[in-house]
């Protein structure tokens, strides 16, 4: 039986990547000020709106709204005509303190009994289809994405 197999690669402006970059920027800020911060941050975005949720434990406060706006603008969403930009989008922060149950699971002196809280680990596989051991469809998708990201960034193709 024949089947079709495909892979996807998205650039920095894709909504999933925007959400990941916002979460990453927030985590980086927490860790810059308190290396023992515990962060579980989820970000969702849509037309004109960003929702940030999760559990945090840190000795420091960070300005979630400013970091979020700066990240969106750095990605390139800077014009209201995009219907999503860092200057005017709504930002809802539903961050709260890490639960005591998770705290007990992740704060242990014995590293072998250390828990991961509610965080999971995703993994893939290596194959010999390409030099970097990635499936050829994914490797090609990444190459195309890198190429058109370069064309957009250098304004070679202004419509991108």
Where are these regions (language model features)?
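Glycine-rich, N-terminal phosphate-binding loop and its surrounding beta-alpha-beta segment
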Residues: 39-42, 48-106
């Amino acid at each position: 039986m024949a089947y079709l197999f495909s892979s996807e690669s998205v650039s920095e402006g894709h909504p999933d990547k925007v959400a990941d970059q916002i979460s990453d920027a927030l985590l980086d800020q927490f860790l810059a000020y308190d290396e023992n911060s515990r962060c579980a941050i989820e970000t969702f975005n849509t037309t004109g709106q960003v929702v940030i949720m999760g559990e945090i434990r840190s000795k420091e406060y960070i300005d979630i709204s400013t970091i979020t706006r700066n990240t969106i603008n750095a990605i390139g969403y800077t014009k209201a005509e995009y219907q999503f930009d860092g200057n005017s989008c709504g930002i809802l922060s539903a961050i709260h303190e890490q639960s005591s149950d998770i705290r007990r699971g992740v704060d242990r002196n014995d590293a072998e009994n250390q828990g991961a809280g509610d965080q999971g680990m995703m993994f893939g596989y290596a194959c010999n289809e390409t030099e970097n051991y990635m499936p050829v469809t994914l490797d090609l998708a990444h190459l195309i994405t890198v190429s058109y990201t370069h064309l957009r960034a250098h304004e070679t193709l202004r419509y991108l």
